[in-house]
Amino acid sequence: MLGLLLFSFHSQAAESLVFSNVWSPEAPPVASVMAGYFTVENKGRKEILIEEIRSPQFKSIEIHRTEHKDGMATMAWQPHVHVPAGKRVELKPGGKHLMMFKPKQAIKHGDTITLHVSLSNNTQQTIHAKVKRH
């Protein structure tokens, strides 16, 4: 019975973040970097940080934020994404986004990218990004 209760609690903690609209724009076949976007909602009562995102299809993935200064857009690395309790955060073009480096094979329109998301509550979620023409 205790094992069942622990499993139930662990599952609820992992499911307190709900991901939607997970996608990546198609890039040229020779591209060494692709972007990724999603909306995430925290259904829990405590803030959760997205601490790391990995994929078997890319060498590495970083979280970036687009900044505008003196008419120039630059990207700044972010150590994590804060998802406040009861709130929604959107990673979108021109804002926070994923930078997925060095795809291990060609990725094209219609493909799916597997993303393993590590969270500050010591859980991990796997989500899937659909590659779309943008």
What do these predicted regions represent?
Residues 1-2:
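Sec-dependent N-terminal signal peptides
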Residues 8-11:
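N-terminal signal peptide c-region/cleavage motif recognized by signal peptidases
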